[in-house]
Design a protein with these regions (language model features):
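Beta-strand->loop->alpha-helix junctions that form or flank phosphate-binding loops
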Residues: 16-23, 27, 42-45, 147-150, ...
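A short, polar/charged loop-to-alpha-helix boundary motif
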Residues: 218-226
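AMP-binding/adenylate-forming catalytic core of the ANL superfamily
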Residues: 20, 56-59, 69-72, 76-77, ...
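Short Gly/Pro-enriched turn/cap motifs at secondary-structure boundaries
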Residues: 38-44, 89-92
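Gly/Ser/Thr-rich phosphate-binding loop
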Residues: 1-38, 49-51, 56-59
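AMP-binding/adenylate-forming catalytic domain of the ANL superfamily
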Residues: 184-208, 226
Length: 226
């Protein structure tokens, strides 16, 4: 949110944001004026109705966090993967891209994270995006990815992989500083227990982070149920 606030302040209210997938099952959009009164939102549904559902597939009330579904949108199927296609829909026929979020009373959608990236540490569900959104505001951080790594007692531990800002070294001092920063602004269970550094995080030319590559490096051949 602070980054987009700065972008709008610098360029003016010309920034538009949308949420959609190549599946074509739904689309949301929001302009700068709307965003400034609904900070963090990715907009309202334009081509389908946005529904937030619980584990049972039934709709949840406003501000309750759950799986994001599109109702009444385009039909799709994953080529050669009938199981994935089936799992993307609930009993109402609404489809999901696998994201978690919530809607406010006006119907604006706020994304929390992807369900597949959720970290389960000590029985607590932790969404990496919340931790990433905080750490990226630190002046010594250029980029960050938060993943779950194996932990003997907790099941998983929160690990932040940080790309230091130019002029700063990825060393033990910076790691300690970032952990302290996180603990001062998040509950301790959400704060990273470990900070690792990379010269540059793997991103697609479009800017999409290849988080799975980072996460898989910690798990190796160990199995993980998400």
């Amino acid at each position: 949110v602070p980054v987009k606030e700065q972008m709008i302040a610098w360029w003016g209210p010309i920034i538009h944001e949308y949420y959609a997938g190549t599946e074509g099952n739904g689309f949301t959009a929001i302009n700068s004026e709307e965003w400034l009164t609904h900070k963090g939102s990715v907009g309202k549904g334009l081509t389908a109705q946005v529904m937030i559902c619980g584990e049972d597939g039934e709709p949840l009330p406003p501000r309750a966090e759950g799986m994001v579904y599109f109702a009444g949108g385009g039909e799709f199927e994953y080529h050669g993967d009938a199981e994935k296609t089936r799992d993307s829909k609930n009993q109402h026929g609404w489809s999901t891209l696998g994201d978690v979020g919530w809607i406010d009373e006006e119907g604006y959608l706020y994304l929390t994270d992807r369900k597949s990236f959720m970290i389960i540490s000590g029985g607590v569900n932790i969404y990496p995006q919340e931790v990433e959104n905080l750490l990226v505001t630190h002046p010594k951080v250029a980029d960050v990815a938060v993943v779950g790594a194996p932990h003997e007692e907790m099941g998983e531990q929160v690990v932040a992989v940080v790309q230091p800002a130019p002029g700063h070294e990825g060393d033990e001092a910076l790691a300690a500083e970032l952990i302290a920063f996180a603990r001062a602004n998040l509950s301790h269970i959400k704060a990273p227990r470990r900070i690792d550094f990379m010269a540059e995080l793997p991103r697609h030319p479009t800017g999409k982070l290849y988080k799975r590559l980072i996460r898989d490096a910690y798990w190796g051949k160990e199995s993980r149920i998400v």
